[in-house]
């Protein structure tokens, strides 16, 4: 190994100009491939392609251009006070204060009634503004597929009696019949009026239950909130929400249209939210934070270098070496991978903080060697032999964490791990090689500058404070261990924050609007999609989820599909019978009998009474097409939209939601079809059969089974049962019981932003702890290979393991929680934490004096760790709380590892090797063996260096040597 390094160093440094030209050519090529790098903003491609949610999401994107909407929210400036009371009511609801919520809602209602004319006028202005905007949006065919803001609800209004539950329609008949009987009595010339009371039937309690059908108010054409203070325009874009570049252009275009409309002249203002806007804002806050973070990181590193080296020349050399390493890394990435993603785009600042460490270690050791020998090539070689091997060991342990990440299912993490792995090794090599070339050229052209690399006597001599600090290692170790145990006591109390909202920018407008929509409309503005192949399957899914099963009712609000607009056929038949009865009841009523205010309802009553049962083919296209693919789509199928009760930031509830609806196993024969068949047998008599009925009496089950086993295909079709369902019934009969009929199922998967985010959470949860353990295992293997012994490997792990314990304990103490982002810091902290132990152990084995070892390597360890710390702590400048939490955890973790490495590890090394017997009996670490100690070809250059005093082997002493002496243990051993 020594011969290889020696020949390589000679080849590079004896021809520094040629080496520099080769380096510049290599940098030029790297720069060329770096410019070809692009950022792939399609986050969908980062998830496992075979994941069911990803597969279905791709299908939805192909069918309708992506799930979700870009939502434009129109509101007016409320000068009367209703809105302020509503806001307080919504907050009280979130806080669980039911009494305050009711009080504020009542106050809001009172304000509206008090200023009814004002709010009516504001409602009209909102609707006029929506008409104006919708026309402009629809004209932009590049970005907008369609806009949902207003619907022709006459189809639903005219067929309202068929949508009512049969028992509710029966109740309406009772009230109508009572009124008719009263009016008939009043028309009798012999009627005697005994009281002034008059019965006026009120149907609001019944009608209000059906006011919102398929998430729409059937009595108002516009997509407006019940309080009439917010109107939504749901824009279905032509592209996918996971394409960030498309999101940006869409957002810019929509906001330009709104701005040019000058809505503010009418007192209306617009807000923006929805799947597309939320995804864009989250990405932009992440990327927007990188520039100030990068600047702060670079400035902090430069300041620390100036503080430790106090020479701008050293800073310039190290920063050029760092720049070269980064450029080569990105050049390799451009050549082999070709693109960065939203995760790997931040890797530059991380590698910058990591890479500068190796340059600092090189420069500190080179100055020490050059001061002793004043032979340039020999000094560089000795630096590489000793510190270089330690740096290689450090680089391999650091990359262990990244290697583990490279096997992640999430491509964002895996590509991050791959780039960070070779990037760390490339930068480690360039920090040594490029810095060495720069020094060689500098001293070749400006020999007088050699004095700036020499250490003065104070820099070579351990201070009295340092000797005193390490003079009582037992006491020092005891104090540090007690402090660690104190903080470690709190470690089990650390909490995991599943609230994904705490990762976002605080008070972001799009997120706040998302909340407000949920409050005002009592719905989620981010529906998920279930894609099925056939119309029969879409009916079965709708039936399975309507009503929502009790076990998932906490996560799912409602499903919306074509079948929301088609009541169960059995219910339609039962309701038609009741309508016939009402018609019969009304025969005695003549228009002349009715008062003027009653007579105006007569035309609508006639429409209601004449309505006929219908099937899905009669549903207007403006309702039906939203559940089908667009004409140009290669994918065919049917969509059922699922409205959740949770949002992206409800981490725990989100996983419950994913577990409930991520994959569904749905019976092919729906309840509504079974109950339609049962109703057709006549067993209900004058009664009715509930469409969602699941349990049957013995007589009902016998009648249903008889029909299932005997009805012809034509009979089933006459009941509006779809052909595919009929084929399923005929294929599997005869049936022994209803459970058998319901046992034939198919599986579905749910797609959408919630599903994708839930998949990411599951990947992090599954891989996080395993990544930590595997990284720890790889680190131990690397240490054993380099140390050639088990005990020193364990000792070097002390700063790491105790540092993590202190980190977690300190987090619990200050109330900092783990989350889905900062948990990934720990595998990285492993790599950072271990390198301090490596440098200290190597130097201790070389000098055999812990005080001298810490005097020489301590400043380098502190400088390199602080530069790393600056890189990570720059994340504290980010507005996005996820990045902010990463910065906090990394800062605490790296600082804890550094403090323990500077205190506890030296004390333990001194205690463990105090007798020197164990040290001499152990195998010498790689880089310090006999073969590395002898190189006769270099001895000829020794006279050119400063006189070297022979240094006898000494134990710990208070004697301060003026010139650092190189210990030649290997020669002693070779004897």
Task: List PLM regions with ranges.
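Solvent-exposed, non-transmembrane loop/terminal regulatory segments of multi-pass membrane proteins
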Residues: 35-85, 89, 96-117, 209-222, ...
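Hydrophobic transmembrane alpha-helices and their membrane-interface caps
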Residues: 315-362, 792-840, 873, 900-903
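Signature of alpha-helical transmembrane segments and their immediate interfacial
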Residues: 1-41, 432, 436-437, 441, ...
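Transmembrane alpha-helices and their membrane-interface boundaries in multi-pass membrane transporters
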Residues: 335-336, 352-367, 388-408, 412-454, ...
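Pore- and gate-forming transmembrane helices of large, multi-pass membrane proteins
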Residues: 290, 319, 371-408, 770, ...
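Alpha-helical transmembrane helix bundles of large polytopic membrane transport and channel proteins
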Residues: 85-231, 269, 553-626, 684-688
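Extracytoplasmic
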Residues: 116, 120-121, 193-312, 602-690, ...
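Juxtamembrane segments of multi-pass membrane proteins
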Residues: 473-594
């Amino acid at each position: 190994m020594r011969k290889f390094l020696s020949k390589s160093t000679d080849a590079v440094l004896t021809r520094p100009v040629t080496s520099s030209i080769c380096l510049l050519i290599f940098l030029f090529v790297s720069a060329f491939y770096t410019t070809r790098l692009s950022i792939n903003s399609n986050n969908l491609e980062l998830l496992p392609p075979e994941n069911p949610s990803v597969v279905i999401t791709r299908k939805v994107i192909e069918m309708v251009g992506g799930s979700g909407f870009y939502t434009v929210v129109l509101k007016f400036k409320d000068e009367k006070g209703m809105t302020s009371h509503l806001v307080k009511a919504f907050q009280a609801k979130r806080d669980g204060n039911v009494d305050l919520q009711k009080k504020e809602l009542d106050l809001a209602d009172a304000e509206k009634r008090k200023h009814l004319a004002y709010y009516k006028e504001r409602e009209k202005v909102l609707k006029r503004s929506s008409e104006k905007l919708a026309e402009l949006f629809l004209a932009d065919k590049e970005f907008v597929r369609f806009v949902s803001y207003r619907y022709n609800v006459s189809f639903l209004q005219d067929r309202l009696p068929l949508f009512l539950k049969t028992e509710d329609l029966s109740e309406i008949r009772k009230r109508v019949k009572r009124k008719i009987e009263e009016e008939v009595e009043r028309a009798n010339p012999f009627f005697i009026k005994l009281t002034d009371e008059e019965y006026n039937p009120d149907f609001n309690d019944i009608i209000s239950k059906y006011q919102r059908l398929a998430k729409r108010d059937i009595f108002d054409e516009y997509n407006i909130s019940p309080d009439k203070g917010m109107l939504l325009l749901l824009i279905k874009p032509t592209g996918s929400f996971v394409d960030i570049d498309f999101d940006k252009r869409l957002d810019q275009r929509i906001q330009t249209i709104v701005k040019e409309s000058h809505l503010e002249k009418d007192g209306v203002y617009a807000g923006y939210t929805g799947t597309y806007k939320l995804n864009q804002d989250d990405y932009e806050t992440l990327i927007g934070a990188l520039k100030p973070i990068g600047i702060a990181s670079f400035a902090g590193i430069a300041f620390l270098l100036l503080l430790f080296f106090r020479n701008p020349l050293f800073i310039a050399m190290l920063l050029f070496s760092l720049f070269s390493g980064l450029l080569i890394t990105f050049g390799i990435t451009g050549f082999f991978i070709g693109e960065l993603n939203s995760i790997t785009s931040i890797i530059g600042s991380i590698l910058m903080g990591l890479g500068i460490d190796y340059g600092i270690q090189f420069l500190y050791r080179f100055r020490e060697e050059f001061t002793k020998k004043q032979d340039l090539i020999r000094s560089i070689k000795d630096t590489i032999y000793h510190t270089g091997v330690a740096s290689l060991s450090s680089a391999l342990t650091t990359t262990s964490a990244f290697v583990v990440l490279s096997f992640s299912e999430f491509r964002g993490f895996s590509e991050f791990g791959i780039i960070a792995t070779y990037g760390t090794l490339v930068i480690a090599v360039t920090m040594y090689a490029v810095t060495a070339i720069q020094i060689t050229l500098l001293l070749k052209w400006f020999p007088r500058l050699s004095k700036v690399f020499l250490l003065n006597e104070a820099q070579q001599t351990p201070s009295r404070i340092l000797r005193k600090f390490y003079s009582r290692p037992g006491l020092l170790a005891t104090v540090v261990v007690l402090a660690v145990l104190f903080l470690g006591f709190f470690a089990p109390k650390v909490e995991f924050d599943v609230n994904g909202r705490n990762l976002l920018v605080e008070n972001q407008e799009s997120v706040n609007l998302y909340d407000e929509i949920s409050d005002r409309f009592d719905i989620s503005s981010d529906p998920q999609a279930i894609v099925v192949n056939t119309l029969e399957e879409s009916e079965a899914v709708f039936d399975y989820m309507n009503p929502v099963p009790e076990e998932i009712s906490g996560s799912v609000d409602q499903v919306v599909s074509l079948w929301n607009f088609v009541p169960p056929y059995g219910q339609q038949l039962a309701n038609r019978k009741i309508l016939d009865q009402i018609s019969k009841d009304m025969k005695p009523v003549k228009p002349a009998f009715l008062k003027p205010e009653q007579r105006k309802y007569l035309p609508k009553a006639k429409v209601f009474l004449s309505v006929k049962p219908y099937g899905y083919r009669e549903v207007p296209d403006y309702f039906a097409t939203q559940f089908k693919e667009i004409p140009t789509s290669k994918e065919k199928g049917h969509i059922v939209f699922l409205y959740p009760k949770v949002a992206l930031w409800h981490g725990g509830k989100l996983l419950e939601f994913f577990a409930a609806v991520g994959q569904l196993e749905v019976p092919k024969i729906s309840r509504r079809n079974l109950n339609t068949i049962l109703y057709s047998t006549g067993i209900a008599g004058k009664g009715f059969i509930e469409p969602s009925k699941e349990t049957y009496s013995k007589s009902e089950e016998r009648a249903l089974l008889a029909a299932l086993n005997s009805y012809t295909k034509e009979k089933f079709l006459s009941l509006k049962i779809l052909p595919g369902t009929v084929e399923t019934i005929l294929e599997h009969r005869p049936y022994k019981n209803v459970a058998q009929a319901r046992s034939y199922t198919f599986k579905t998967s749910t797609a959408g932003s919630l599903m994708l985010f839930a998949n990411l959470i599951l990947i992090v949860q599954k891989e996080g702890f395993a990544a930590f353990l595997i990284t720890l295992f790889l680190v131990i293997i690397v240490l054993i290979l380099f140390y050639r012994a088990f005990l020193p490997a364990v000792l070097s792990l002390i700063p790491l393991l105790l540092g993590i314990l202190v980190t977690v304990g300190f987090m619990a103490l200050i109330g900092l929680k783990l989350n889905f982002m900062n948990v990934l810091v720990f595998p990285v902290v492993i790599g950072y934490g271990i390198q301090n132990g490596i440098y200290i152990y190597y130097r201790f084995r070389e000098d055999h004096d812990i005080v001298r070892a810490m005097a020489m390597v301590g400043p380098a360890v502190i400088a390199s760790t602080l530069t790393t710390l600056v890189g990570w702590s720059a994340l504290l400048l980010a507005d996005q709380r996820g990045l902010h939490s990463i910065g906090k955890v990394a800062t605490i973790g790296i600082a804890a590892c550094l403090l323990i490495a500077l205190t506890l590890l030296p004390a333990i090394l001194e205690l463990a090797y105090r007798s020197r017997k164990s040290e001499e009996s152990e195998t010498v670490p790689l880089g310090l063996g006999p073969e590395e100690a002898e190189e006769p070809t270099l001895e000829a250059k020794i006279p050119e260096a400063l006189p070297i005093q022979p240094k006898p082997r000494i134990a710990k002493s208070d004697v301060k040597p003026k010139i650092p002496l190189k210990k030649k243990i290997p020669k002693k051993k070779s004897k």
